[in-house]
Design a protein with these regions (language model features):
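Catalytic nucleophile-loop/oxyanion-hole region of alpha/beta-hydrolase
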Residues: 14, 44, 70-105, 277-283
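Short beta-strand/loop motif that positions the catalytic acidic residue
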Residues: 231, 237-239, 243
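The serine-hydrolase catalytic nucleophile loop
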Residues: 40-53, 67, 249
Length: 298
């Protein structure tokens, strides 16, 4: 087990500054690096630190960052989710890592969960300087996930999303939707999502629980599954059989599209279980084994 340090890292991305934690293991050789960020509307302190620590103890450098508009990263309005901007933040962090002389830039790994798992799949299909990716319960097909909404909910969500988008064009304050809600309209409307999402929230950090609604329209059109055939690096893909947010068939189809480069797992858990207890331990051990096989150890 390696000791490590954690250093604050601030990187310019567009007109904003991205805040990150840089986990640096104490090793004789330059370590491989894992770049990590969270899913929809989540901060890096929402259960991702436990992953970063375990990777660093295993000898891997880790860059764990918050998107613009979130956490200590800059940008307004606060808590805005922009798929385009968040993908650009990923590209910025990768470009920054390529310039650091203290790590092995030939061994860059992307790690994503839920929505950021979709980002990792997109980037693996797009970029040539990524050596492997690891995704858990990834968001792969917004068109299919949109079918989770009832016929009463979907038009309402689209209406609020459109109102927020048009209002932003003329400088109006954002119209927001809850990320989760037990009874009302929200981004994650399934029965287990309310308790599941709140189980990862860190009460030591500000989180309003609502985000500007404009992203809803983009989410239901976001389909990383379409780019999966262009991936030619090793992929660890962990799906959950009881996932109420990510249709199982969409995960299976995505994995089929990535073959033969994918190591695919289906576990009998719900979407948010992977951050806790036995499922976290199983996930981290599986991920470390994958890294050992495809990236090596220090």
């Amino acid at each position: 087990m390696h000791s490590y340090t954690v250093e604050p890292l601030y990187v310019k991305s567009g007109q904003e500054v991205i805040a990150a934690d840089f986990y640096r293991p104490k090793t004789e050789n330059k370590p491989a690096v894992i770049i990590m960020a969270h899913g929809l509307a989540a901060l890096r302190q929402f259960k991702l630190v436990q992953y970063a620590k375990r990777f660093a103890q295993a000898g891997y450098a880790v860059v764990l960052f918050d998107y613009r508009y979130w956490g200590r990263s800059t940008g307004r309005p606060r808590e805005l989710v922009s798929l385009t901007s968040q993908l650009e933040d990923w590209r910025t962090m990768i470009a920054h890592i390529l310039e650091r002389k203290s790590i092995d830039t030939r061994r860059i790994v992307l790690w994503g969960t839920s929505l950021s798992g979709g980002y990792a799949l997109n980037l693996a299909a797009e970029l040539k300087n990524v050596q492997a990716i690891m995704v858990q319960v990834p968001f792969v097909d917004g068109t299919e996930s949109a079918k989770l909404y009832s016929l009463q909910q979907l038009p309402k969500a689209l209406k609020i999303s459109s109102q927020d988008y048009m209002g932003a064009k003329v400088g109006m304050s954002p119209k927001t939707l809850p990320v989760v809600d037990k009874n009302g309209l929200c981004f994650m409307p399934t029965a287990d999502s309310y308790d599941g999402y709140l189980s990862i929230v860190n009460p030591d950090y500000f989180w309003s629980g609502e985000i500007p609604a404009r992203v809803f329209f983009n989410l239901i059109r976001y389909r990383p599954i379409q780019d999966a055939r262009n991936i030619s690096v090793p992929v660890l893909f962990i799906a959950s059989k009881q996932d109420s947010l990510i249709p199982m068939e969409s995960s299976r189809e995505t994995a089929t599209n990535i073959a033969p480069f994918v190591q695919y797992h289906e576990w009998d858990m719900q979407h948010f279980d992977i951050y806790h207890g036995q499922w976290f331990e199983k996930a981290i051990s599986t991920q470390l084994e994958f890294l050992h096989q495809h990236i090596g150890v220090n």
